[in-house]
């Protein structure tokens, strides 16, 4: 038999009293209705008693008030303060109201509408709003006392003893075990990932210190370096700087960018971004070297590359050949950059006072900009100073290669080395690590050989040259007095004695 017309609601009480439904059921259709819900306050108390719950300790004291809310629906006519409309949009499809005072729109709910009126500044500014607030029609009866402690966790169940991982156990509880266990720190929970770059620095600590603290750098910073030694070194640095350009280009040719949904977080793409910036930096650096020579009138001869310089160039070719990995090449590039920075930071520590000239650093992240080059005839018609190479060292070279911007560029190179090591090392990484150690150690050792032996040291004040014989004494005297002093190194002790 088909179901009768749905002219009634689905309320259980209506069905029980509906004659059409009774006749339909008598004909053998449908099934018995579920019994009415007996849940009420009396049933709840009976249920608690049947399971042994004792609610006697929850009785309120005589001085306590039951937290209640005034029946705003029966005392206030919300139609006076809200306009009702039906929202049939796709997202809502419900009855909504709009505040006549401020235009606030929300779903129809008398309690929430009353809550809005208590916070509506436009409504409270009216005379009617002030009257309702004064009469207490919009104020909830706030509970005067704190709820029982069992509801806020101050008195937990004695059978639920929780062991807190802290230095001090909760009050009223007995610590479990002989002593309380301290909470582990964030550092122990999140250990730092292994760093290949830091490993390379640690395993070559002594070798790196000897390379970046060469006696040539101490003389360069203190102002006692001869012009001949400076010109020899600058000529060799020119060969290394020019060789960096094809070396970096070969590394770019090794990059194969994969198909990925997040290209900017791919290590090979980030490496490509760094190498493109490095090529721009190298071009700027070559321009910087030539501009500084012209500006300070430096007479650098066309010396042939020395054996150490040739070995450095061969190392560039070896680390960028087809059999070498991209990681090896990036390790060598970072090694050269950090050798420049650490060396001239060491030389800068010997400068007595900071020069008042503007910083000449041409590095930025990731590339740098160079001030406009000086004209070739900057020294035309002027008397060339004898200490022009010392001035160029302090005002140009040292400031450029120990600047903060260059330091950040070196840090970026280091981070890329670690990213590539995490992504491209194969197996247990032992073979890749050994290859990187070999390249890094060769670069550090060759760097120390590029510096010429400081044989022609320019002397300063007579008294200063006689007082000190060792390098550390000269460092302290130079920093305290600011005078040009003679510094003897372990390679030229006899030569310095003859000069005195």
From Swiss-Prot:
User: Looking at the record's lineage, which domain of life comes first?
Assistant: Eukaryota
Q: Where is this region: Disordered?
A: 161-197, 457-500
Q: Does the keyword Cell membrane apply?
A: no
| Statement: the UniProt record of this protein carries the keyword Hydrolase | no
Listed InterPro entries: Haem_Oase-like_multi-hlx, Polyketide-peptide_reg
Q: Which organism is it from?
A: Fusarium pseudograminearum (strain CS3096)
Task: Please describe what this protein does.
Answer: The two putative transcription factors FPSE_09188 and FPSE_09189 could be responsible for orchestrating expression of the W493 A and B biosynthesis cluster genes. W493 A and B consist of six amino acid residues D-allo-thr, L-Ala, D-Ala, L-Gln, D-Tyr, and L-Val/L-Ile linked to a 3-hydroxy-4-methyltetradecanoic acid polyketide chain.
Among Gene3D superfamilies, the record links this protein to: Heme oxygenase-like
User: What is the protein name stated in its UniProt record?
Assistant: Probable transcription factor FPSE_09189
| Gene Ontology CC: one annotated term | nucleus
Instruction: Give me the stretches of Polar residues compositional bias.
Output: 475-484
Q: Where in the cell is it found?
A: Nucleus
Q: Which Gene Ontology MF annotations are present?
A: DNA binding
| Record-linked PANTHER family | REGULATOR PAB1642, PUTATIVE (AFU_ORTHOLOGUE AFUA_3G11955)-RELATED (PTHR41813:SF2)
Membrane spanning segments where? none
In which residue ranges is the amino acid composition biased (Basic and acidic residues)? 459-474
* UniProt entry keywords in alphabetical sequence: DNA-binding, Nucleus, Transcription, Transcription regulation
């Amino acid at each position: 038999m088909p179901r009768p017309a749905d002219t009634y609601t689905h309320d259980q009480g209506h069905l029980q009293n509906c004659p059409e439904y009774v006749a339909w059921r008598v004909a053998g259709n449908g099934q018995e209705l579920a019994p009415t819900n007996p849940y009420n306050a009396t049933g709840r108390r009976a249920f608690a008693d049947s399971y042994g719950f004792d609610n006697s300790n929850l009785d309120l004291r005589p001085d306590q008030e039951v937290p209640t809310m005034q029946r705003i629906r029966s005392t206030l006519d919300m139609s006076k303060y809200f306009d009702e409309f039906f929202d049939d949009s796709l997202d809502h499809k419900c009855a909504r109201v709009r505040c006549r005072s401020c235009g606030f729109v929300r779903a129809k709910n008398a309690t929430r509408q009353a809550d809005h009126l208590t916070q509506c500044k436009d409504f409270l500014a009216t005379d009617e709003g002030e009257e309702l607030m004064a009469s207490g029609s919009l104020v909830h009866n706030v509970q005067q006392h704190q709820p029982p402690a069992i509801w806020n966790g101050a008195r937990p169940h004695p059978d639920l003893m929780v062991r807190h991982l802290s230095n001090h156990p909760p009050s009223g509880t007995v610590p479990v075990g002989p002593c309380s266990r301290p909470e582990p720190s964030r550092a122990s929970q999140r250990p730092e990932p292994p760093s290949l770059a830091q490993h390379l620095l640690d395993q070559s600590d002594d070798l790196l210190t000897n390379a970046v603290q060469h006696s040539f750098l101490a003389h360069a910073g203190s102002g006692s370096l001869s012009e001949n030694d400076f010109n020899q070194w600058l000529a060799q640095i020119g060969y290394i700087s020019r060789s960096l350009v094809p070396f970096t280009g070969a590394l770019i040719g090794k990059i194969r960018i994969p198909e990925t949904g997040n290209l900017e977080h791919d290590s090979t793409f980030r490496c490509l971004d760094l190498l493109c910036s490095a090529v721009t930096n190298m071009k700027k650096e070559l321009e910087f070297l030539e501009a500084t020579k012209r500006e300070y009138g430096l007479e650098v001869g066309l010396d042939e590359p020395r054996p150490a310089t040739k070995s450095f160039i061969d190392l560039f070719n070896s680390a960028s050949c087809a059999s070498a990995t991209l990681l090896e090449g990036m390790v060598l590039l970072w090694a050269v950059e950090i050798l420049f920075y650490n060396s001239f930071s060491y030389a800068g520590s010997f400068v007595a006072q900071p020069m008042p000239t503007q910083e000449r650093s041409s590095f930025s992240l990731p590339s740098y900009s160079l001030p406009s080059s000086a004209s070739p005839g900057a020294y035309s018609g002027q008397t060339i100073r004898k200490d022009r190479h010392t001035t160029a060292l302090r005002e140009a070279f040292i400031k450029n290669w120990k600047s903060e911007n260059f330091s950040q560029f070196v840090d970026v190179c280091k981070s890329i080395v670690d990213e590539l090591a995490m992504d491209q090392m194969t197996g247990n990484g032992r073979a890749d690590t050994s290859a990187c150690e070999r390249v890094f150690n060769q670069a550090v050792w060759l760097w120390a050989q590029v510096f010429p032996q400081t044989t022609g040291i320019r002397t300063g004040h007579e008294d200063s040259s006689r007082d000190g014989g060792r390098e550390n004494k000269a460092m302290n005297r130079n920093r305290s007095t600011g005078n040009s002093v003679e510094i003897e190194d372990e390679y030229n002790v006899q030569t310095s004695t003859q000069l005195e």
